[in-house]
């Protein structure tokens, strides 16, 4: 049987896999003996490709040369050939081309994956990296101001109640006082977060602060209770905002070296004895509330801005449960901004029996954020997720066809998709290796082909522009019609190859639904602009501006 392959960029995403007969061509006969299709090996390095070529039975044209990934093979008189090619860590597509004297050619493309096999669901060190510039922190400050103005302070203050107390170390006795905050409101907030070599310089200016509450007390063994209200025209709290990793809970924030300045203090405590007011230090309560609540309010914002999840989470992906855990491992702050690294693991429930994913050791990428931000996503994280998706079986598709010589195409994944660097341009692409397409007519197999594709990665806005997500772009496919089943479709190998390409749409949709669940930074009120995608030492790199 003729072995023919066509490489083409898809210009359409037709759902059906149909085509019509074309002109029969007479390429040489080509058989690959090694490596086997869908090979997984433990390390990168040189791989020997062997096979046999012969003239086409009709044309009889002699085979002049054989190329394997553009490396000329040693071609023997009996038609056997061999070539040594370099396989790098990750996924590699091996294309063998045999060309005869008339210019006709036959091709075979197959995939090989090389590297350390690791169990799915394992923690990936430094899976996510993020850097924010000083300019980005200025934008973050504006978002923080808006957030504080609309913040419900009470859940934050609840564990601290009573907010002021004295004389109650042994319980409520003859001389004690306790003051509870009932609500916090304000007219305006101005937050400043500036990275310095000493940490994040934090300043919160609150105008029109109003803190109603109630007090319970006793003086000379006489108990009492009453309402109290503390107001201030302006409260300014400043200090160093300390952001530290807090395991699966994300980041923890606290304020050190704080200073508090209060202007226009008004304490309304009619009926409360002066002694109680004094030892409760109600004149300091306004500053105390802001100095404690404002830094804690920064915690969820920092988690969103820096990529933390504030605890393990589960999301639904095409009916499957994806469990995510992000553990910050380090945060380094200096006058230019901040660099954050996060360890991450993803596990789709029910895929624990997967053979695993190929792990490639990466160095830290260049995280220069410019005047905006930079994000790095390790290929290992995405490859782990795609190995799990393969194990679910959701990528094995049955696609009906009408009006042709076959009525259905069944696609089975023999290898998990992988992100790998394209040897031609160094860009990271998703490699779909050796997807096996079986064409059937009323349930009877009538042809078989192997699909190998490289798909561009794109970065797109998410969450209405307030976040970013990865998306698959335009694929380039190579389809090799296989000899396992005689081609009874009455289509040429070229036609069958073109028909098969349309089936990639389903695979792209499945992978895209998976990629959008990677937890990337998103800050309420700030939009990601001028997004660019690149690669650096095994990381997908996203860079852009914050507005």
Model regions and ranges:
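C-terminal motif of bacterial Sec signal peptides marking the signal peptidase cleavage site
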Residues: 13-16
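Short, compositionally biased P/S/T/A/G/V-rich stretches that sit at domain boundaries
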Residues: 19-46
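Aromatic/hydrophobic beta-strand junction motif of beta-rich domains
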Residues: 49-57
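Short strand-edge motifs at loop-to-beta-strand transitions and within beta-strands
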Residues: 79-83
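Surface-exposed, short loops/turns at beta-strand junctions within beta-sandwich domains
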Residues: 84-92
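Edge beta-strands of extracellular beta-sandwich domains
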Residues: 103-115
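Extended, low-charge, aliphatic-rich alpha-helical segments
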Residues: 115-207, 268-547
């Amino acid at each position: 049987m003729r072995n023919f392959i066509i490489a083409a960029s898809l210009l359409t995403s037709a759902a059906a896999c149909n085509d019509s007969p074309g002109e029969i061509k007479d390429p040489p006969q080509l058989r690959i003996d090694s490596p086997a299709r869908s090979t997984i090996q433990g390390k990168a390095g040189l791989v020997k490709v062997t096979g046999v070529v012969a003239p086409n039975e009709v044309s009889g044209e002699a085979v002049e040369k054989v190329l394997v990934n553009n490396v000329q093979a040693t071609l023997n008189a009996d038609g056997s050939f061999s070539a040594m090619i370099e396989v790098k860590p990750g996924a590699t597509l091996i294309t063998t081309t045999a060309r005869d004297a008339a210019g006709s050619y036959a091709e075979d493309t197959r995939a090989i994956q090389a590297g350390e096999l690791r169990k799915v669901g394992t923690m990936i060190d430094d899976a996510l990296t993020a850097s924010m510039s000083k300019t980005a922190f200025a934008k973050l400050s504006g978002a923080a101001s808006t957030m504080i103005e609309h913040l419900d302070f009470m859940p934050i203050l609840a564990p601290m109640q009573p907010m002021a107390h004295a004389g109650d170390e042994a319980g409520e006795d003859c001389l004690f006082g306790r003051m509870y905050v009932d609500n916090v409101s304000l007219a305006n907030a101005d937050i400043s977060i500036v990275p310095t070599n000493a940490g994040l310089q934090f300043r919160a200016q609150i105008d029109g602060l109003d803190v109603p509450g109630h007090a319970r007390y006793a003086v000379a063994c006489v108990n009492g209770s009453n309402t109290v209200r503390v107001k201030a025209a302006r409260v300014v709290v400043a200090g160093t905002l300390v952001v530290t990793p807090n395991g699966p809970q994300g980041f923890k924030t606290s304020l050190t070296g704080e200073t508090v300045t209060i202007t226009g203090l008004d304490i309304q405590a009619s009926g409360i004895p002066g002694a109680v007011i004094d030892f409760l230090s109600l004149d300091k309560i306004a500053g105390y509330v802001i100095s404690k609540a404002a830094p804690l309010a920064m915690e969820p914002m920092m988690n969103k801005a820096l990529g933390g999840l504030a605890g393990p989470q589960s999301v639904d992906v095409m009916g499957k449960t994806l469990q995510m855990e992000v553990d910050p491992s380090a945060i380094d702050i200096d006058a230019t901004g901040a660099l954050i690294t996060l360890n991450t693991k993803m596990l789709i429930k029910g895929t624990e029996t997967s053979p695993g994913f190929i792990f490639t050791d990466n160095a830290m990428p260049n995280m220069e954020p410019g005047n905006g931000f930079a994000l790095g996503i390790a290929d290992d994280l995405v490859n782990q997720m795609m190995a799990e998706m393969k194990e679910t079986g959701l990528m094995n598709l049955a696609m009906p066809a009408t009006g042709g010589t076959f009525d259905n195409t069944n696609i089975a994944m023999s290898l998990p998709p992988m992100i790998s660097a394209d040897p031609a341009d160094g860009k990271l692409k998703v490699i779909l290796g050796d997807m096996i397409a079986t064409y059937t007519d009323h349930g009877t197999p009538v042809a078989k082909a192997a699909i190998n594709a490289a798909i561009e990665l794109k970065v797109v806005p998410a969450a209405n522009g307030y976040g970013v997500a990865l998306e698959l772009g335009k694929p380039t496919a190579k389809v090799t019609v296989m000899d396992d089943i005689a081609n009874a479709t009455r289509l040429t190998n070229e036609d069958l190859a073109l028909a098969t390409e349309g089936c990639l749409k389903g695979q792209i949709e499945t992978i895209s639904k998976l990629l959008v669940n990677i937890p990337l930074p998103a800050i309420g009120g700030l939009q990601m602009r001028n997004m660019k995608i690149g690669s650096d030492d095994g990381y997908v790199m996203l860079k852009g501006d914050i507005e």
